[in-house]
Amino acid sequence: MNVIFLGPPGAGKGTQSKRLEARYGIAQISTGDMLRAEVAAESAIGKQARALMDAGQLVPDDVIVAMLESRIAQPDCAKGFILDGFPRTQGQAVALDSMLKRRGARIDVVLFLEVDEEALADRIAGRFTCATCGAGYNDLFKKPKVEGTCDVCGGHSFVRREDDRRETVAARLVAYRKQTAPILPYYEAEGLLRRIDGMADIDTVTAKVFEIMDAITKK
């Protein structure tokens, strides 16, 4: 089962991807992590990407797709994979489909988390994490049980991401609307797109994701 998660930044794609991975045994793939791993391993593709990044250039789609092809050939992807954060453009979507077709594979479903952008901005701006263990919290709906103390490790230091500031979030949402949102019709035309209310609580969203996945796997 090969899955793509789509949705604006902060919609909960990472959280739901991890839950999907745990339930169905399919590997979650972060293109950012994948890129860093190839560079660290000094593979041929990694060296090419490193040279581009050192020159201040973006890594082109064909290099990313080549890395992805190498990644999905790994044993942990035998049952399938989950893509979180890729593709981001229609060009990437087309390149991904072409690569998978060459391998005799395909995308089985595209899960789109729909959210209200104003509420989403509030949600993102409220995020903070434990500086010690990385446990996540939110000012709006998930504060530590004891104020100033991490529920998981008991730490007392918390951090907020610089790009979670409201003005930064607004810029990220604008970029998303211009770049990524237009690929929704592409997958809708393929009959792969499934829309999910991303504003529901996390467990409700997970239940809907599992419902969709179970229906597909039973076909």
Curated annotation (Swiss-Prot):
Cell compartment(s), UniProt: Cytoplasm
Sites where the protein binds ATP: 10-15, 127, 200
Reaction it catalyzes: AMP + ATP = 2 ADP
Ranges where the record places region NMP: 30-59
Region annotation (LID) ranges: 126-164
A GO biological process held by the record: AMP salvage
EC number: 2.7.4.3
Binding-site list for AMP: 31, 36, 57-59, 85-88, 92, 161, 172
Domain of life: Bacteria
Pfam families found in the cross-reference section: ADK, ADK_lid
Pathway: Purine metabolism; AMP biosynthesis via salvage pathway; AMP from ADP: step 1/1
Key words of the record: ATP-binding, Cytoplasm, Kinase, Metal-binding, Nucleotide biosynthesis, Nucleotide-binding, Transferase, Zinc
Positions that bind Zn(2+): 130, 133, 150, 153
Chain ranges passing through the membrane: none
Family annotation (NCBIfam families): adk, PRK00279.1-2, PRK00279.1-3, PRK14527.1
PANTHER family: NUCLEOTIDE KINASE
Entry text on domains: Consists of three domains, a large central CORE domain and two small peripheral domains, NMPbind and LID, which undergo movements during catalysis. The LID domain closes over the site of phosphoryl transfer upon ATP binding. Assembling and dissambling the active center during each catalytic cycle provides an effective means to prevent ATP hydrolysis. Some bacteria have evolved a zinc-coordinating structure that stabilizes the LID domain.
Subunit structure and binding partners: Monomer.
Function: Catalyzes the reversible transfer of the terminal phosphate group between ATP and AMP. Plays an important role in cellular energy homeostasis and in adenine nucleotide metabolism.
Name assigned to this protein: Adenylate kinase
Organism, as annotated: Gluconacetobacter diazotrophicus (strain ATCC 49037 / DSM 5601 / CCUG 37298 / CIP 103539 / LMG 7603 / PAl5)
Lineage: Bacteria, Pseudomonadati, Pseudomonadota, Alphaproteobacteria, Acetobacterales
Protein's gene: adk
